[in-house]
Amino acid sequence: RRRRQPVTFPILGTSVTDYATALGIEDWTGATGVNISGTCDLAPISEQEDMLTELFPDAKTVGILYCSAESNSKYQAELFEKELEADGIEYKEYTAADSNEIQSVTQSAAEECDVIYVPTDNTMAANTQIINNICLPAKVPVIAGEQGICSGCGVATLSISYYDIGYRAGEMAYEILAEGADITAMEIESAPEVTKMYNAQICEELALPFRMTMSHRDRIGWRSSQKWQNKNDGRKER
């Protein structure tokens, strides 16, 4: 059997929450230093925590619900916990190893917490109906890490646009293939803006005062490289 040669051609990722964790990079500088780059789907954790405390100032305990098998979810949870600690808010972690455990874990969270936070998490995103079927009758609101989860079980989110980060990854590919950009020096880029969204139906059922339809969006600028902002002023036609 022939030994596989190391892959050296450029690899671009998108919707990766934390490249350092995914690639096992300890000394993170923004660029991987290898043949991998791309765009990141990490939402602004600090602003999400600010949203939670603003909407639910009387919350005593926040539950953080995620799948323990997803390293990116754990990374987000740890960042969110640091924000809660800085604000002196108690929190409890509720982790499910897989979809089979979501119902029991969510039930515990709904019984013990005032608000639940669900980060960007593939397992939770695929099971929002289970979460909603428990949290809605229990009158426990969910702050979501992204739009899809918010649509299924959340009351509000600050979400990135997956279209935008996918588009940017395509632009990065063009820069490499057509312009000769060095992928080892290309920094991982984040979404150029984030969107504040409310789930009108769930807010109404919970009798929350900040009802807003998902089609009405309050777009809030977020971190991005100036290079990306300039490109998106007038997207190129290929």
State what each model feature region is.
Residues L12-T14, V62-L65, C113-A125, V142-G145:
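Periplasmic-binding protein-like
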Residues Y19-A59, I160-A181:
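Hydrophobic alpha-helical segments within soluble ligand-binding/sensing domains
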Residues S37-E85, D182, E187-C203:
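An alpha-beta-alpha
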Residues E175-K236:
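Hinge/cleft segment of the Venus flytrap/periplasmic-binding protein
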